[in-house]
Amino acid sequence: MDKKDQKAIASLWKLGGLKPRELARLAWMEIYDGDLLTRAAALSYYFLLALFPLLIFLTSMLGLFAEAGTELRSNLLRYLGSVAPRSASQLVRTTVQEITEGATGGKLSLGLLAALWFASFGMSAIGDTLNAAYGVRESRPFWKLRLISLGLTAALAALIITALALVLYGGGIGEGLATRYDLGGAFKSAWNLIQWPIVLAFVLFAFALTYYYAPDLKHQKWYWITPGSLTGVALWLLVSFVFRVYLHFFDRYSLTYGSLGAVIILLLWFYMTGAAILVGGKVNA
């Protein structure tokens, strides 16, 4: 790394010469006065549109593997229940169970294509917001923008699935590696510690890809970790935790809206997720 690159990285982490408190105040003003929350609402809509085609794809794929698929499906739903609000995860669980029984190759292909297509519109919305944050106008042709959005969506899906696999089966993977290469118990203990930083690295990499390719920036340098990606991940984890705690003690959506309560809760969680992604982009800008 030459001195020029070192200066660029140092400048990035100096946050434009702003103190953290000043940066937080400026980011809040941008959120309050701008259209970030409106764009986050649009993202929640695209996330919801992409969710159920994605479930059709995943459950159809799992249905082709019978016993192993049943175990993996149960583990995925159990993990979703630990991250998403209870009512939202229950809605997803019910939908998955209804779809799984009729898994076919046609549903597999259709679900994958539909999930990628709808999710790519959400990626385009993220790009529009980041362009506004950086003060640039979209100049890429439509076909190129669609390809970038689809490619980003596919890459993020692969990263998220890999991270989930490590979360759900990290222990088994470590034991398998230790047994195959005769690495011993020390490796198992070390693996149990390092698998979580690896999962975090996958998530940060997903955010870094989004912030690098989604906006129309001509001469942007690549950074594995940025203040915005750290802010986005931390904020997403925080709002997910706070929302779960709130619903645990003050869940009135199901009482007020009946069966629609779970859908509303899922949309709110997607809304907060979209806002966290966009706030991270604002911090980088």
Label each PLM-derived region with a short phrase.
Residues 1-285:
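Membrane-embedded alpha-helices and immediately adjacent juxtamembrane helical segments
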